[in-house]
């Protein structure tokens, strides 16, 4: 199952023009959960009810986002400092819809307020169908190492499914998280950036014990082109090429001369130009 980008419930309410794109789902994506964020129980419940007939198998609530503009608006991981308000939001949403409500949160807001276990119990009491736990505090952002033991503690404290998140970059990481925490599922985030092969490799490794090789240079090149073509079809060539600049940093991470390649792509404005650059640079590798 995949999850949409997080979408502001208020933005949907006020018909922000960007929300339509964020809520869009292609049938080829398979099961998709839509992720909302917000702190107003009435608005969150109303929007959940409004979109529940959409192409989503579940509605997820982001209570773990560490970005300052979200936190300063008392949304995302700020709600970990206000579990009473979080409880109101989740209770209202569960009552408003028939589809499963899930919630993602962190270890805590900072090292002085590690409350993931209590937060999970609260969410379970509200009637949520599952929780996803990221093993870092909001204060950490993505620095340091994810604490998988907090995921284990949450798993032992609740009966609903627990999804582990944080520092899963390889199939071996995925297996180790399952073994060390007992979690019911794994959420891969940053580990998939520039590495869409990770899902197939994790699944194969867990099912067979065999570790599939990583992608070849030509497979990476072909995937970059495929990604660029799909973005172009979806957003238009100009926007697609601009967005591909950041994706290229992930696709080429660790490659020889990757810095030069990333510098050159900043000058690329067309899909044809991208193909020519990749042909020149990646064939040379």
Protein language model features and the residues they cover:
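Hydrophobic faces of well-ordered beta-strands that scaffold small-molecule active sites
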Residues: 2-4, 32-36, 59, 101-105, ...
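Alpha/beta catalytic cores of nucleotide-metabolism and tRNA/nucleoside-modifying enzymes
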Residues: 88-91, 96-98, 112-130, 142, ...
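Conserved radical SAM core fold
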Residues: 7-13, 41, 63-77, 133-140
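Active-site glycine- and acidic-residue-rich loops that bind
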Residues: 42-43, 84, 105-118
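Non-cysteine beta-strand/loop elements that form the S-adenosyl-L-methionine
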Residues: 4, 58-66, 125-135, 188-191
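Glycine-rich tight-turn/loop motif centered on a GG-T
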Residues: 68-85, 136-148, 208-213
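Glycine-rich, positively charged N-terminal anion/phosphate-binding segment
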Residues: 1-57
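Active-site-proximal loop/turn and secondary-structure-junction residues that shape catalytic pockets
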Residues: 8, 38, 65-67, 101, ...
């Amino acid at each position: 199952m995949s999850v949409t980008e997080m979408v502001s419930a208020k933005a949907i309410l006020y018909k922000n023009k960007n929300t339509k794109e964020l809520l869009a789902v292609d049938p080829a994506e398979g099961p998709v959960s839509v992720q909302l964020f917000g702190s107003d129980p009435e608005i969150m419940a109303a929007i959940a009810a409004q979109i529940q007939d959409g192409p989503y198998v579940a509605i997820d609530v982001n209570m773990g986002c560490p970005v300052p503009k979200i936190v300063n608006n008392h949304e995302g991981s700020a709600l970990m400092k206000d579990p009473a308000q979080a409880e109101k939001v989740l209770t209202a949403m569960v009552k408003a819809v028939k589809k499963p409500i899930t919630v993602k949160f962190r270890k805590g807001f900072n090292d002085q307020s590690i409350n993931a276990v209590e937060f999970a119990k609260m969410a379970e009491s509200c009637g949520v169908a599952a929780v996803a736990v990221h093993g870092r505090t909001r204060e950490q952002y993505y620095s340091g190492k994810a604490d998988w033991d907090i995921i284990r503690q949450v798993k032992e404290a609740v009966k609903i499914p627990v999804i582990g998140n944080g520092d899963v970059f390889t199939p071996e990481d995925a297996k180790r998280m399952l073994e060390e925490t007992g979690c019911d599922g794994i959420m891969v985030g940053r580990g998939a950036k520039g590495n869409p092969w990770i899902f197939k490799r994790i699944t194969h490794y867990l099912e067979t014990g065999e570790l599939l090789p990583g992608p070849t240079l030509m497979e990476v090149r072909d995937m970059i082109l495929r990604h660029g073509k799909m973005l172009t079809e979806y957003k238009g060539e100009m926007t697609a090429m601009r967005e591909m600049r950041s994706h290229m940093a992930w696709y080429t991470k660790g490659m020889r001369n990757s810095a030069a390649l990333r510098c050159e792509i900043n000058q690329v404005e067309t899909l044809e130009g991208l193909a020519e650059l990749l042909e020149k640079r990646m064939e040379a590798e």
